[in-house]
Design a protein with these regions (language model features):
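Short glycine/proline- and aromatic-enriched beta-strand/turn motifs that initiate or cap beta-hairpins
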Residues: 26-78
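Short loop/turn motifs that connect adjacent beta-strands in outer-membrane beta-barrel proteins
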Residues: 28-35, 69-71, 108-117, 163-167, ...
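Gram-negative (and chloroplast) outer-membrane scaffold detector with strong preference
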Residues: 63-137, 196-198
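Residue-level detector of the transmembrane beta-barrel scaffold of outer-membrane proteins
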Residues: 37-41, 73-77, 116-120, 168-172, ...
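Transmembrane beta-barrel architecture of outer-membrane proteins
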Residues: 37, 57-61, 96-100, 150-154, ...
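Outer-membrane beta-barrel "beta-signal"
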Residues: 186-198
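Cleavable N-terminal export/targeting peptides
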Residues: 1-34
């Protein structure tokens, strides 16, 4: 089969057009209303008097996001968090199992819609487990605080970066307030998440 010069030129032109048009066509698929995302994130609580990276506290969260118009989104997440409270020579375990529902609003983004800065609010409810539901410590002391159901509100900021059109990495800072917790009502934390757009 003989390939003519016109066919080579046509083929080259089509390839060049695809390369030029592909980024804008794919970019148009970002932040589509009703698009959903699945996110896994890890976090660390910020505890007064403890080094951020030398503590045993951590959190894991699984979230489902739903995009609205103009890059806004709502989310529903389920998370587990743990940290240790110091009492004499003991470390009293504190664990939280929380469900969080919230809204995120984009405040800033770059021209190419690759990086976004979000501010959001949330409501949360869950169970706070103190010392594995045991009221007596190993030295015989009795805890005045116990495990309980908790509820609260949160304020969060995030910087989200599109690695590809479907994969987003985000750094987050959250401030949660648990109204009926006897241990720490104010819970600041830092986190890092990876979201896949479905």
């Amino acid at each position: 089969m003989v390939i003519t010069m016109k066919q080579k030129l046509l083929f080259s032109s089509l390839c060049a057009a695809l390369v030029v048009e592909l980024p804008t066509a794919v970019q148009a698929q970002r932040l589509v209303p009703s698009q959903k995302g699945l996110e896994v994130s890890a976090s660390m609580p910020i505890v007064k008097g403890k080094s951020l990276f030398k503590q045993d506290g951590f959190g894991l969260t699984l979230s489902l996001s739903h995009y609205l118009k103009r890059g806004k989104y709502t989310f529903l997440s389920a998370g587990y968090e743990q940290q240790a409270l110091s009492y004499r020579s003991y470390q009293v375990p504190l664990r939280d199992y929380l469900v969080q529902m919230g809204y995120a609003h984009p405040l800033l983004s770059d021209k190419g819609k690759n990086v976004f800065f979000y501010l959001g609010t949330s409501a949360l409810v869950g169970y706070e487990q103190l010392n594995r539901d045991k009221m007596i410590l190993p030295d015989g002391a009795k805890l005045l605080d116990g495990s309980r159901w908790v509820y609260g509100a949160g304020l969060h900021t995030s910087v989200e970066l599109f690695l590809t059109d479907r994969i987003i990495v985000g750094g987050k800072a959250q401030l949660r307030y648990l109204f009926n917790s006897d241990v720490h009502r104010l819970r600041p934390m830092l986190g890092l998440g990876l979201r896949y757009q479905l």
